[in-house]
From Swiss-Prot:
Domain of life: Bacteria
The protein, known as: UDP-N-acetylmuramate--L-alanine ligase
Classification of source organism: Bacteria, Bacillati, Bacillota, Clostridia, Eubacteriales
Molecular function as annotated in GO: ATP binding; UDP-N-acetylmuramate-L-alanine ligase activity
Annotated metabolic or biological route of this protein: Cell wall biogenesis; peptidoglycan biosynthesis
Root EC class: ligase
PANTHER family xref list: UDP-N-ACETYLMURAMATE--L-ALANINE LIGASE, UDP-N-ACETYLMURAMATE--L-ALANINE LIGASE-RELATED
Biological process annotations from GO: cell division; cell wall organization; peptidoglycan biosynthetic process; regulation of cell shape
Record's keyword terms, sorted: ATP-binding, Cell cycle, Cell division, Cell shape, Cell wall biogenesis/degradation, Cytoplasm, Ligase, Nucleotide-binding, Peptidoglycan synthesis
Family, per entry: Belongs to the MurCDEF family.
Keyword Cell wall biogenesis/degradation carried by entry: yes
Amino acid sequence: MAFTPGKWIHMVGIAGAGMSGIARVLAQQGYKVSGSDLQVNDTTSRLEEIGVEIFKGHSSSNLKEGVDLLVTSSAVPQDNIELRLAREKKIPILKRGQMLAHLANAKKAVAVAGAHGKTTTTSMLYMVLANCGTEPSFIVGGELQGSELNAKLGRGDYFVVEADESDASFLDLRPYIALITNVEDDHLDYYKSVDNIRKAFRQFVEQIRPEGFAMLYGGDAFNRSLVKDLTLNKRLLFYGEDLSNDYYFLNWESIGLGSHFDVYKRELGFLGRFELAVPGKHNALNALAAIASALELGLEMEPIKSALKNFHGARRRFQIQGQKALVTVVDDYAHHPTEIRATIDAARNFHSGRVIVVYQPHRYSRTQLLGRQLGEALINADLAIITEVYSAGEEAIPGISGEVVCQAAQSIGCHSVYIPQREEIIPYLLQICQENDLIITMGAGDIWKLGLQLLEVLPESVLKV
């Protein structure tokens, strides 16, 4: 079909982070948009405010006469009743990644991929480009704190997107800038081997437009290996802490909930001192990727600085949920060993009290593959509480549970407990909480709800230390 505003697009699984962002941009472009999901939430309510029709649950009645195209999330099973009916009616069906690529490829796509830091880096890049006056469009996998938006249609040339490598859908993109944070052995349920993951990322770089470039984290071995690939005729730039990178930072300092650092370009030297309002050296690296990309686009330094100074993160990325009785509750999406370690280290950098982590393992397949590494990544927590696995729709695997992670943590001396029943965690926390504790709910599932529940029942005072 021809993609022209006015056509009717129905989206199955519309409440998801990626799908809801696409729905917003399509509606802003003038398409008629409807969608269904098992759960409705604040995001779908905001879509209704701009004219998107939302159906709770899946039903044949949701697919009205006149729908021109159906877009489906990868989380929706192929036997979904709305998908089946669309096939019967010969309504064209696109996957989420294909629709995202159609939108982004129509402009200069700035695509952020990699195992870690995608949402934060994408959000930073959007804020920087917007503050520099380029009026970019964006779709990101988490809401920007302070705006409650995960997408926006801009009038400018750039379209900043979080590229999803989990199912190789990022290979539908033809990026102007391909930014890769790092490449790790994640999503092996799809790729089957690390070699296949690397092949996909190489293809992603190969698909960069001739006038574009790759911005690559220089501390990643795979990214560095691309330099030796003589058949890859692309402009490759590197960022990181090491002075061998095209862009690097020195003199990083943790200051409160943020940090300061000096940015350099290899052939030019010192470029400026930057301030961040989000914690951790990993976020300084995310910011450096945004800084380097913006400077390569010829944008001015001062608006880049001010954008990052005023960036307060994306939802579920070290998000402070509240404080009560001098106990601070933070939520973070970290669900891979590298992310878990970085988040705990960031907390340690600014917090003088105890750091207590409530970690919810995500997916049985990931827990089976990375259970030991997940447990070992919790080592710097004063206490790690491990819950049962959040299945994300997967079938349970015999012998695989949160206890696997807990045993791995205990084996290296991490003080950890396995509490599979969610309703038992808050009473346990209430017994042990003391002043100046920092409690981090952590994982890609629904563990964030527990932090809010804890704040509701925390007494006005807890044990003093």
